Protein backbone atom coordinates (compact mmCIF):
# COMPACT_ATOMS: atom_id res chain seq x y z
CA UNK A 1 0.00 0.00 0.00
CA UNK A 2 1.31 3.44 -0.91
CA UNK A 3 0.93 6.89 0.62
CA UNK A 4 2.21 10.38 0.01
CA UNK A 5 2.76 12.98 2.70
CA UNK A 6 5.16 15.91 2.81
CA UNK A 7 3.53 18.16 5.40
CA UNK A 8 6.29 18.10 8.04
CA UNK A 9 9.93 19.16 8.10
CA UNK A 10 11.23 15.61 8.57
CA UNK A 11 9.54 14.18 5.48
CA UNK A 12 11.59 11.36 3.91
CA UNK A 13 14.57 12.47 1.80
CA UNK A 14 13.24 16.02 1.94
CA UNK A 15 10.67 15.16 -0.73
CA UNK A 16 7.86 13.09 0.79
CA UNK A 17 6.99 9.93 2.71
CA UNK A 18 5.76 7.18 0.39
CA UNK A 19 6.23 3.87 2.26
CA UNK A 20 5.47 5.01 5.80
CA UNK A 21 5.69 8.27 7.67
CA UNK A 22 8.90 9.30 9.39
CA UNK A 23 6.49 10.36 12.14
CA UNK A 24 5.36 6.74 12.54
CA UNK A 25 2.20 7.11 10.46
CA UNK A 26 1.29 3.97 8.51
CA UNK A 27 0.03 4.20 4.91
CA UNK A 28 -3.40 3.12 6.17
CA UNK A 29 -3.53 6.02 8.63
CA UNK A 30 -2.12 8.50 6.09
CA UNK A 31 -4.72 7.52 3.50
CA UNK A 32 -7.60 7.72 5.96
CA UNK A 33 -6.42 11.20 6.93
CA UNK A 34 -6.45 12.17 3.25
CA UNK A 35 -10.01 10.87 2.93
CA UNK A 36 -11.07 12.70 6.09
CA UNK A 37 -9.73 15.95 4.64
CA UNK A 38 -11.60 15.22 1.39
CA UNK A 39 -14.85 14.84 3.34
CA UNK A 40 -14.09 17.99 5.35
CA UNK A 41 -13.71 20.03 2.17
CA UNK A 42 -17.14 18.86 1.02
CA UNK A 43 -18.70 19.80 4.35
CA UNK A 44 -17.05 23.22 4.06
CA UNK A 45 -18.58 23.79 0.61
CA UNK A 46 -22.07 23.04 1.91
CA UNK A 47 -21.71 25.01 5.13
CA UNK A 48 -20.31 27.97 3.24
CA UNK A 49 -23.37 27.94 1.00
CA UNK A 50 -25.66 27.75 4.02
CA UNK A 51 -23.75 30.59 5.70
CA UNK A 52 -24.59 32.94 2.82
CA UNK A 53 -28.22 32.98 3.92
CA UNK A 54 -27.58 32.75 7.64
CA UNK A 55 -28.15 29.02 8.09
CA UNK A 56 -24.64 27.71 8.78
CA UNK A 57 -24.26 24.71 11.06
CA UNK A 58 -22.40 25.10 14.36
CA UNK A 59 -21.98 21.31 14.36
CA UNK A 60 -20.19 21.59 11.01
CA UNK A 61 -17.96 24.38 12.32
CA UNK A 62 -16.78 22.18 15.19
CA UNK A 63 -16.44 19.04 13.10
CA UNK A 64 -14.25 20.86 10.59
CA UNK A 65 -11.70 22.28 13.00
CA UNK A 66 -11.56 19.08 15.02
CA UNK A 67 -11.04 16.93 11.91
CA UNK A 68 -8.35 19.27 10.62
CA UNK A 69 -6.57 19.10 13.98
CA UNK A 70 -6.74 15.29 13.81
CA UNK A 71 -4.59 15.35 10.66
CA UNK A 72 -1.80 17.53 12.07
CA UNK A 73 1.57 15.80 12.33
CA UNK A 74 1.84 13.52 15.39
CA UNK A 75 -1.75 14.09 16.53
CA UNK A 76 -3.63 10.91 15.65
CA UNK A 77 -2.30 7.48 14.71
CA UNK A 78 -5.53 5.57 15.36
CA UNK A 79 -6.97 4.43 12.03
CA UNK A 80 -10.24 3.31 13.62
CA UNK A 81 -10.93 6.68 15.24
CA UNK A 82 -10.22 8.42 11.92
CA UNK A 83 -12.58 6.05 10.10
CA UNK A 84 -15.29 6.87 12.63
CA UNK A 85 -14.73 10.57 11.97
CA UNK A 86 -15.07 9.93 8.22
CA UNK A 87 -18.39 8.14 8.79
CA UNK A 88 -19.67 10.98 10.97
CA UNK A 89 -18.47 13.47 8.38
CA UNK A 90 -20.36 11.71 5.60
CA UNK A 91 -23.53 11.74 7.71
CA UNK A 92 -23.05 15.44 8.45
CA UNK A 93 -22.41 16.20 4.79
CA UNK A 94 -25.61 14.37 3.82
CA UNK A 95 -27.57 16.36 6.35
CA UNK A 96 -26.18 19.65 5.02
CA UNK A 97 -26.79 18.62 1.40
CA UNK A 98 -30.49 18.19 2.18
CA UNK A 99 -30.63 21.86 3.18
CA UNK A 100 -28.97 23.51 0.19
CA UNK A 101 -28.33 22.83 -3.49
CA UNK A 102 -24.84 23.29 -4.94
CA UNK A 103 -24.61 23.78 -8.69
CA UNK A 104 -21.65 22.06 -10.35
CA UNK A 105 -20.74 20.52 -7.00
CA UNK A 106 -17.20 19.10 -6.76
CA UNK A 107 -16.49 15.44 -6.03
CA UNK A 108 -15.90 16.39 -2.39
CA UNK A 109 -19.62 17.17 -2.17
CA UNK A 110 -21.11 14.36 -4.23
CA UNK A 111 -19.11 11.30 -3.13
CA UNK A 112 -20.63 8.97 -0.58
CA UNK A 113 -19.18 5.55 0.08
CA UNK A 114 -19.19 2.91 2.75
CA UNK A 115 -16.16 1.68 4.66
CA UNK A 116 -15.37 -0.97 2.05
CA UNK A 117 -14.72 1.83 -0.46
CA UNK A 118 -12.68 4.12 1.79
CA UNK A 119 -9.24 2.80 0.91
CA UNK A 120 -9.80 2.86 -2.84
CA UNK A 121 -11.20 6.39 -2.75
CA UNK A 122 -8.41 7.62 -0.46
CA UNK A 123 -5.82 6.74 -3.12
CA UNK A 124 -7.35 9.38 -5.42
CA UNK A 125 -7.89 12.35 -3.09
CA UNK A 126 -4.50 13.02 -1.49
CA UNK A 127 -1.87 15.64 -2.21
CA UNK A 128 -1.03 14.24 -5.65
CA UNK A 129 -4.59 14.75 -6.91
CA UNK A 130 -3.30 18.10 -8.21
CA UNK A 131 -0.94 17.60 -11.14
CA UNK A 132 0.37 21.16 -11.55
CA UNK A 133 3.35 21.50 -9.18
CA UNK A 134 2.84 25.17 -8.34
CA UNK A 135 -0.92 24.90 -7.85
CA UNK A 136 -0.33 21.85 -5.64
CA UNK A 137 2.31 23.69 -3.63
CA UNK A 138 0.11 26.70 -2.97
CA UNK A 139 -2.94 24.57 -2.21
CA UNK A 140 -1.00 22.62 0.39
CA UNK A 141 0.54 25.79 1.84
CA UNK A 142 -3.00 27.07 2.45
CA UNK A 143 -4.16 23.63 3.62
CA UNK A 144 -1.40 23.38 6.20
CA UNK A 145 -1.95 26.94 7.33
CA UNK A 146 -5.64 26.17 7.86
CA UNK A 147 -4.71 23.03 9.81
CA UNK A 148 -2.50 25.07 12.12
CA UNK A 149 -5.23 27.66 12.50
CA UNK A 150 -7.70 24.89 13.39
CA UNK A 151 -5.53 23.86 16.34
CA UNK A 152 -5.61 27.38 17.77
CA UNK A 153 -9.34 27.69 17.07
CA UNK A 154 -10.03 24.45 18.96
CA UNK A 155 -8.07 25.54 22.04
CA UNK A 156 -9.96 28.84 22.14
CA UNK A 157 -13.27 27.04 21.58
CA UNK A 158 -12.58 24.80 24.57
CA UNK A 159 -12.36 27.97 26.67
CA UNK A 160 -15.62 29.35 25.31
CA UNK A 161 -14.22 31.63 22.60
CA UNK A 162 -15.29 31.40 18.99
CA UNK A 163 -15.22 33.80 16.07
CA UNK A 164 -17.71 33.22 13.23
CA UNK A 165 -15.47 35.23 10.90
CA UNK A 166 -12.61 32.75 11.40
CA UNK A 167 -14.96 29.78 10.86
CA UNK A 168 -16.27 31.42 7.70
CA UNK A 169 -12.79 32.05 6.32
CA UNK A 170 -11.55 28.54 7.06
CA UNK A 171 -14.50 27.06 5.23
CA UNK A 172 -14.21 29.52 2.35
CA UNK A 173 -10.54 28.56 1.97
CA UNK A 174 -11.31 24.83 2.09
CA UNK A 175 -14.03 25.32 -0.52
CA UNK A 176 -11.59 27.20 -2.75
CA UNK A 177 -9.20 24.24 -2.52
CA UNK A 178 -11.82 22.05 -4.24
CA UNK A 179 -11.63 24.20 -7.37
CA UNK A 180 -9.79 22.67 -10.30
CA UNK A 181 -9.74 26.02 -12.14
CA UNK A 182 -8.13 28.05 -9.36
CA UNK A 183 -5.12 30.11 -10.51
CA UNK A 184 -1.71 30.78 -9.00
CA UNK A 185 -2.62 34.42 -8.42
CA UNK A 186 -5.85 33.47 -6.65
CA UNK A 187 -3.96 31.03 -4.44
CA UNK A 188 -1.33 33.62 -3.54
CA UNK A 189 -4.13 35.97 -2.48
CA UNK A 190 -5.69 33.12 -0.48
CA UNK A 191 -2.34 32.39 1.17
CA UNK A 192 -1.99 35.99 2.35
CA UNK A 193 -5.58 35.98 3.61
CA UNK A 194 -4.81 32.79 5.53
CA UNK A 195 -1.99 34.64 7.29
CA UNK A 196 -4.30 37.53 8.21
CA UNK A 197 -6.84 35.17 9.72
CA UNK A 198 -4.02 33.31 11.44
CA UNK A 199 -3.25 36.53 13.31
CA UNK A 200 -6.91 36.72 14.36
CA UNK A 201 -6.90 33.09 15.52
CA UNK A 202 -3.76 33.57 17.61
CA UNK A 203 -5.11 36.82 19.07
CA UNK A 204 -8.34 35.04 20.00
CA UNK A 205 -6.44 32.22 21.72
CA UNK A 206 -4.27 34.73 23.57
CA UNK A 207 -7.42 36.44 24.83
CA UNK A 208 -8.99 33.11 25.79
CA UNK A 209 -5.91 31.95 27.69
CA UNK A 210 -5.22 35.21 29.51
CA UNK A 211 -8.86 35.89 30.42
CA UNK A 212 -9.12 32.45 32.02
CA UNK A 213 -5.69 32.04 33.54
CA UNK A 214 -4.25 35.56 33.85
CA UNK A 215 -1.29 36.98 31.99
CA UNK A 216 1.84 34.81 32.06
CA UNK A 217 4.36 36.12 34.55
CA UNK A 218 8.03 35.52 35.26
CA UNK A 219 8.14 32.05 36.80
CA UNK A 220 10.71 29.56 37.98
CA UNK A 221 9.87 25.99 37.00
CA UNK A 222 11.27 22.93 38.76
CA UNK A 223 12.77 20.35 36.37
CA UNK A 224 13.36 17.79 39.11
CA UNK A 225 10.81 15.48 40.73
CA UNK A 226 9.01 14.93 44.02
CA UNK A 227 8.39 11.66 45.84
CA UNK A 228 4.72 11.24 44.91
CA UNK A 229 3.03 9.37 42.05
CA UNK A 230 2.59 11.64 39.06
CA UNK A 231 0.70 12.20 35.82
CA UNK A 232 2.61 13.70 32.90
CA UNK A 233 0.63 16.04 30.65
CA UNK A 234 1.83 16.66 27.10
CA UNK A 235 0.41 18.78 24.30
CA UNK A 236 -1.08 22.26 24.38
CA UNK A 237 -4.62 22.25 25.79
CA UNK A 238 -4.73 24.33 28.98
CA UNK A 239 -8.38 23.47 29.69
CA UNK A 240 -7.43 19.80 29.95
CA UNK A 241 -4.61 20.38 32.42
CA UNK A 242 -6.78 22.75 34.46
CA UNK A 243 -9.50 20.13 34.85
CA UNK A 244 -6.95 17.45 35.68
CA UNK A 245 -5.39 19.71 38.31
CA UNK A 246 -8.80 20.29 39.87
CA UNK A 247 -9.66 16.59 39.89
CA UNK A 248 -6.31 15.58 41.44
CA UNK A 249 -6.17 18.28 44.09
CA UNK A 250 -5.75 16.70 47.51
CA UNK A 251 -5.19 13.19 46.14
CA UNK A 252 -1.44 13.06 46.71
CA UNK A 253 -0.84 12.81 42.97
CA UNK A 254 1.47 15.37 41.37
CA UNK A 255 0.98 16.79 37.88
CA UNK A 256 4.00 17.37 35.65
CA UNK A 257 4.14 19.14 32.32
CA UNK A 258 5.95 17.85 29.26
CA UNK A 259 7.29 19.67 26.19
CA UNK A 260 4.76 22.29 24.97
CA UNK A 261 2.75 22.12 28.21
CA UNK A 262 5.65 23.76 30.11
CA UNK A 263 4.06 27.26 29.87
CA UNK A 264 1.15 26.12 32.09
CA UNK A 265 3.55 27.03 34.92
CA UNK A 266 3.54 30.68 33.79
CA UNK A 267 -0.20 31.32 34.22
CA UNK A 268 -1.29 32.55 37.70
CA UNK A 269 -4.51 30.51 37.72
CA UNK A 270 -2.65 27.29 36.93
CA UNK A 271 0.56 27.77 38.91
CA UNK A 272 -1.53 28.30 42.05
CA UNK A 273 -2.04 24.53 42.27
CA UNK A 274 0.60 23.26 44.67
CA UNK A 275 0.65 19.82 43.05
CA UNK A 276 1.69 21.26 39.67
CA UNK A 277 5.09 19.88 40.48
CA UNK A 278 7.35 20.77 37.57
CA UNK A 279 8.31 20.06 33.98
CA UNK A 280 9.61 16.59 33.15
CA UNK A 281 11.93 16.07 30.23
CA UNK A 282 12.54 17.96 27.05
CA UNK A 283 11.04 18.36 23.60
CA UNK A 284 8.51 15.85 22.25
CA UNK A 285 10.92 13.73 20.23
CA UNK A 286 12.79 12.50 23.31
CA UNK A 287 9.69 10.88 24.80
CA UNK A 288 10.64 7.28 23.95
CA UNK A 289 13.43 7.45 26.52
CA UNK A 290 11.97 9.93 29.00
CA UNK A 291 8.56 8.28 29.36
CA UNK A 292 10.21 5.03 30.42
CA UNK A 293 11.51 6.66 33.61
CA UNK A 294 8.46 8.75 34.43
CA UNK A 295 6.67 5.65 35.80
CA UNK A 296 3.22 7.24 35.85
CA UNK A 297 0.54 7.66 33.18
CA UNK A 298 0.99 10.14 30.32
CA UNK A 299 -1.86 12.25 28.94
CA UNK A 300 -1.65 13.58 25.39
CA UNK A 301 -3.99 16.55 25.06
CA UNK A 302 -2.83 17.32 21.50
CA UNK A 303 0.12 16.45 19.30
CA UNK A 304 3.01 15.48 19.61
CA UNK A 305 2.75 11.70 19.97
CA UNK A 306 5.60 9.42 18.96
CA UNK A 307 4.31 5.84 18.62
CA UNK A 308 6.16 3.80 21.27
CA UNK A 309 8.46 0.93 20.44
CA UNK A 310 6.88 -2.56 20.64
CA UNK A 311 8.84 -3.30 23.82
CA UNK A 312 8.18 0.07 25.51
CA UNK A 313 7.24 -0.31 29.17
CA UNK A 314 5.00 2.77 29.09
CA UNK A 315 2.63 1.64 26.30
CA UNK A 316 -0.16 0.83 28.75
CA UNK A 317 0.33 4.17 30.50
CA UNK A 318 -0.63 6.32 27.49
CA UNK A 319 -3.94 8.20 27.46
CA UNK A 320 -5.22 10.40 24.65
CA UNK A 321 -8.01 12.96 24.44
CA UNK A 322 -9.36 15.63 22.11
CA UNK A 323 -8.18 15.23 18.51
CA UNK A 324 -5.42 12.80 19.46
CA UNK A 325 -5.39 9.05 19.07
CA UNK A 326 -3.08 6.05 19.29
CA UNK A 327 -4.09 2.45 18.79
CA UNK A 328 -3.93 0.64 22.12
CA UNK A 329 -4.10 3.82 24.20
CA UNK A 330 -7.03 4.69 26.46
CA UNK A 331 -9.11 7.59 25.15
CA UNK A 332 -10.61 10.16 27.55
CA UNK A 333 -13.99 11.18 26.06
CA UNK A 334 -15.06 14.73 25.30
CA UNK A 335 -16.98 16.96 27.73
CA UNK A 336 -20.74 16.52 27.81
CA UNK A 337 -23.56 18.74 29.04
CA UNK A 338 -21.16 21.45 30.19
CA UNK A 339 -19.35 19.12 32.58
CA UNK A 340 -15.61 18.51 32.88
CA UNK A 341 -13.84 15.64 31.19
CA UNK A 342 -13.75 12.62 33.47
CA UNK A 343 -10.11 11.89 34.27
CA UNK A 344 -10.88 9.31 36.97
CA UNK A 345 -9.41 6.39 35.00
CA UNK A 346 -6.00 8.05 34.62
CA UNK A 347 -6.07 9.24 38.25
CA UNK A 348 -6.75 5.70 39.48
CA UNK A 349 -3.94 4.45 37.26
CA UNK A 350 -1.54 6.99 38.77
CA UNK A 351 -2.32 5.75 42.29
CA UNK A 352 -0.85 2.36 41.34
CA UNK A 353 2.40 3.79 39.97
CA UNK A 354 5.78 4.57 41.47
CA UNK A 355 6.98 8.20 41.60
CA UNK A 356 8.93 9.45 38.59
CA UNK A 357 12.68 8.97 38.41
CA UNK A 358 14.63 12.22 38.22
CA UNK A 359 16.39 12.81 34.90
CA UNK A 360 17.35 16.42 35.66
CA UNK A 361 17.45 18.84 38.55
CA UNK A 362 17.29 22.58 38.95
CA UNK A 363 14.99 25.28 37.63
CA UNK A 364 14.30 27.12 34.41
CA UNK A 365 12.70 30.55 33.99
CA UNK A 366 9.92 31.59 31.62
CA UNK A 367 6.72 33.59 31.40
CA UNK A 368 7.85 36.42 29.13
CA UNK A 369 4.67 36.83 27.09
CA UNK A 370 3.71 40.27 25.82
CA UNK A 371 2.13 41.66 29.01
CA UNK A 372 5.17 40.71 31.10
CA UNK A 373 7.70 42.07 28.60
CA UNK A 374 5.72 45.27 28.09
CA UNK A 375 5.72 45.68 31.89
CA UNK A 376 9.52 45.61 31.60
CA UNK A 377 9.48 47.92 28.56
CA UNK A 378 11.35 50.80 30.20
CA UNK A 379 14.16 48.48 31.24
CA UNK A 380 14.32 46.85 27.80
CA UNK A 381 14.22 50.16 25.91
CA UNK A 382 16.95 51.62 28.11
CA UNK A 383 19.12 48.55 27.49
CA UNK A 384 18.67 48.98 23.73
CA UNK A 385 19.36 52.72 23.81
CA UNK A 386 22.47 52.28 25.95
CA UNK A 387 23.80 49.56 23.67
CA UNK A 388 23.60 46.88 26.37
CA UNK A 389 21.25 45.00 24.03
CA UNK A 390 22.49 45.12 20.45
CA UNK A 391 19.97 42.78 18.86
CA UNK A 392 17.05 40.45 19.52
CA UNK A 393 16.86 37.04 17.89
CA UNK A 394 13.43 35.48 17.50
CA UNK A 395 14.12 31.75 17.69
CA UNK A 396 10.55 30.54 18.11
CA UNK A 397 9.14 27.40 16.56
CA UNK A 398 9.47 23.66 16.82
CA UNK A 399 12.10 21.12 17.75
CA UNK A 400 12.64 17.80 16.01
CA UNK A 401 14.83 14.74 15.63
CA UNK A 402 17.18 15.79 12.84
CA UNK A 403 20.81 16.02 13.93
CA UNK A 404 21.13 19.27 12.01
CA UNK A 405 18.96 20.92 14.67
CA UNK A 406 22.04 21.05 16.88
CA UNK A 407 22.60 24.23 14.83
CA UNK A 408 20.16 26.03 17.14
CA UNK A 409 22.05 25.07 20.28
CA UNK A 410 25.33 26.14 18.72
CA UNK A 411 23.75 29.36 17.44
CA UNK A 412 22.47 30.26 20.92
CA UNK A 413 25.80 29.42 22.56
CA UNK A 414 27.78 31.53 20.10
CA UNK A 415 25.57 34.61 20.12
CA UNK A 416 27.40 37.59 21.66
CA UNK A 417 26.56 38.50 25.25
CA UNK A 418 24.79 41.69 24.13
CA UNK A 419 22.01 39.80 22.35
CA UNK A 420 18.67 38.44 23.61
CA UNK A 421 16.73 35.40 22.36
CA UNK A 422 12.93 35.69 22.14
CA UNK A 423 11.35 32.25 21.94
CA UNK A 424 8.07 30.34 21.99
CA UNK A 425 7.29 26.73 21.18
CA UNK A 426 9.37 23.62 21.79
CA UNK A 427 12.33 25.04 19.84
CA UNK A 428 13.32 26.50 23.22
CA UNK A 429 14.55 23.14 24.47
CA UNK A 430 17.64 23.47 22.29
CA UNK A 431 18.91 26.29 24.53
CA UNK A 432 16.63 27.11 27.47
CA UNK A 433 18.82 25.20 29.92
CA UNK A 434 22.11 26.76 28.78
CA UNK A 435 23.87 29.16 31.20
CA UNK A 436 23.45 32.20 28.94
CA UNK A 437 23.15 34.74 31.75
CA UNK A 438 21.35 38.06 31.65
CA UNK A 439 21.75 41.69 30.58
CA UNK A 440 21.14 44.12 33.43
CA UNK A 441 18.77 41.60 35.00
CA UNK A 442 17.01 40.74 31.74
CA UNK A 443 17.47 37.01 30.98
CA UNK A 444 19.08 36.38 27.61
CA UNK A 445 16.39 33.81 26.81
CA UNK A 446 12.87 35.21 27.09
CA UNK A 447 10.35 32.38 26.74
CA UNK A 448 6.87 33.61 25.83
CA UNK A 449 5.24 30.17 25.95
CA UNK A 450 3.73 27.73 23.46
CA UNK A 451 4.03 27.92 19.67
CA UNK A 452 0.84 30.02 19.47
CA UNK A 453 2.55 32.51 21.78
CA UNK A 454 4.63 33.56 18.80
CA UNK A 455 1.75 36.04 18.70
CA UNK A 456 3.23 37.54 21.88
CA UNK A 457 6.55 38.00 20.14
CA UNK A 458 4.80 39.88 17.34
CA UNK A 459 3.01 42.10 19.89
CA UNK A 460 6.35 42.80 21.59
CA UNK A 461 7.89 43.73 18.24
CA UNK A 462 5.01 46.07 17.41
CA UNK A 463 5.30 47.70 20.85
CA UNK A 464 9.02 48.28 20.33
CA UNK A 465 8.27 49.69 16.88
CA UNK A 466 5.87 52.15 18.51
CA UNK A 467 8.29 53.09 21.31
CA UNK A 468 11.14 53.74 18.90
CA UNK A 469 8.89 55.60 16.45
CA UNK A 470 9.72 53.37 13.50
CA UNK A 471 7.52 53.26 10.40
CA UNK A 472 8.57 49.75 9.41
CA UNK A 473 8.64 46.76 11.77
CA UNK A 474 11.64 45.49 9.82
CA UNK A 475 13.74 48.45 11.00
CA UNK A 476 13.83 47.02 14.53
CA UNK A 477 17.04 45.34 15.73
CA UNK A 478 15.30 41.94 15.46
CA UNK A 479 16.40 38.89 13.46
CA UNK A 480 13.95 36.04 12.81
CA UNK A 481 15.67 32.65 12.84
CA UNK A 482 12.79 30.21 13.19
CA UNK A 483 12.83 26.42 13.42
CA UNK A 484 9.76 24.75 11.94
CA UNK A 485 8.39 21.22 12.08
CA UNK A 486 4.63 20.99 11.54
CA UNK A 487 1.55 22.86 10.41
CA UNK A 488 1.17 25.20 13.38
CA UNK A 489 4.55 26.61 12.42
CA UNK A 490 3.13 27.19 8.93
CA UNK A 491 0.31 29.39 10.23
CA UNK A 492 2.78 31.24 12.48
CA UNK A 493 4.95 31.93 9.42
CA UNK A 494 1.98 33.12 7.35
CA UNK A 495 0.80 35.31 10.26
CA UNK A 496 4.22 36.96 10.56
CA UNK A 497 4.21 37.65 6.82
CA UNK A 498 0.73 39.15 7.16
CA UNK A 499 2.07 41.49 9.87
CA UNK A 500 4.72 42.71 7.44
CA UNK A 501 7.73 40.87 8.85
CA UNK A 502 10.36 40.14 6.20
CA UNK A 503 13.67 38.30 5.97
CA UNK A 504 12.52 35.37 8.09
CA UNK A 505 15.00 32.50 8.11
CA UNK A 506 13.50 29.01 8.28
CA UNK A 507 15.33 25.84 9.19
CA UNK A 508 16.75 23.37 9.42
CA UNK A 509 15.38 22.89 5.87
CA UNK A 510 12.79 24.71 3.81
CA UNK A 511 9.43 22.94 3.38
CA UNK A 512 9.31 20.12 0.83
CA UNK A 513 5.83 21.26 -0.19
CA UNK A 514 7.20 24.52 -1.61
CA UNK A 515 7.80 24.12 -5.34
CA UNK A 516 10.83 25.96 -6.79
CA UNK A 517 8.58 28.66 -8.24
CA UNK A 518 6.57 29.17 -5.04
CA UNK A 519 9.79 29.24 -3.04
CA UNK A 520 11.09 31.96 -5.35
CA UNK A 521 7.92 34.02 -4.85
CA UNK A 522 8.48 33.89 -1.08
CA UNK A 523 12.13 34.84 -1.51
CA UNK A 524 11.42 37.71 -3.91
CA UNK A 525 8.47 39.20 -2.03
CA UNK A 526 9.26 38.45 1.60
CA UNK A 527 12.98 37.72 1.77
CA UNK A 528 12.40 34.20 3.12
CA UNK A 529 15.71 32.38 3.54
CA UNK A 530 17.24 29.23 4.93
CA UNK A 531 20.18 28.72 7.28
CA UNK A 532 23.83 27.77 6.78
CA UNK A 533 26.21 27.38 9.74
CA UNK A 534 25.91 29.06 13.11
CA UNK A 535 29.14 31.01 12.59
CA UNK A 536 28.23 32.19 9.10
CA UNK A 537 24.70 33.16 10.07
CA UNK A 538 25.71 35.05 13.21
CA UNK A 539 28.27 37.01 11.21
CA UNK A 540 25.66 37.81 8.57
CA UNK A 541 22.90 38.74 11.02
CA UNK A 542 25.17 41.04 13.05
CA UNK A 543 26.78 42.73 10.06
From Swiss-Prot:
Task: List residues modified as Cysteine persulfide.
Answer: 398
Q: Which HAMAP family match?
A: Hydroxylam_reduct
Annotated residues that bind [4Fe-4S] cluster are located at: 5, 8, 17, 23
Report keywords, A-Z: 4Fe-4S, Cytoplasm, Iron, Iron-sulfur, Metal-binding, Oxidoreductase
Cofactor note as given: Binds 1 [4Fe-4S] cluster. Binds 1 hybrid [4Fe-2O-2S] cluster.
Principal location: cytoplasm
> Needs which cofactor?
[4Fe-4S] cluster; hybrid [4Fe-2O-2S] cluster
Give the main EC class.
oxidoreductase
- A Pfam family of the record is Prismane
Catalyzed chemical reaction(s): A + NH4(+) + H2O = hydroxylamine + AH2 + H(+)
Which Gene Ontology cellular component terms are annotated?
cytoplasm
Catalytic activity, EC? 1.7.99.1
State any GO BP term from the record.
response to hydrogen peroxide
Q: Per UniProt, where does hybrid [4Fe-2O-2S] cluster bind?
A: 236, 260, 304, 398, 426, 451, 486, 488
Location(s), subcellular: Cytoplasm
Q: Does the keyword Oxidoreductase apply?
A: yes
Q: Which organism is it from?
A: Bacteroides fragilis (strain YCH46)
- Kindly list the GO molecular function terms attached to this UniProt entry: 4 iron, 4 sulfur cluster binding; hydroxylamine reductase activity; metal ion binding; peroxidase activity
- State the name under which the record lists this protein: Hydroxylamine reductase
Family named by the database record:
Belongs to the HCP family.
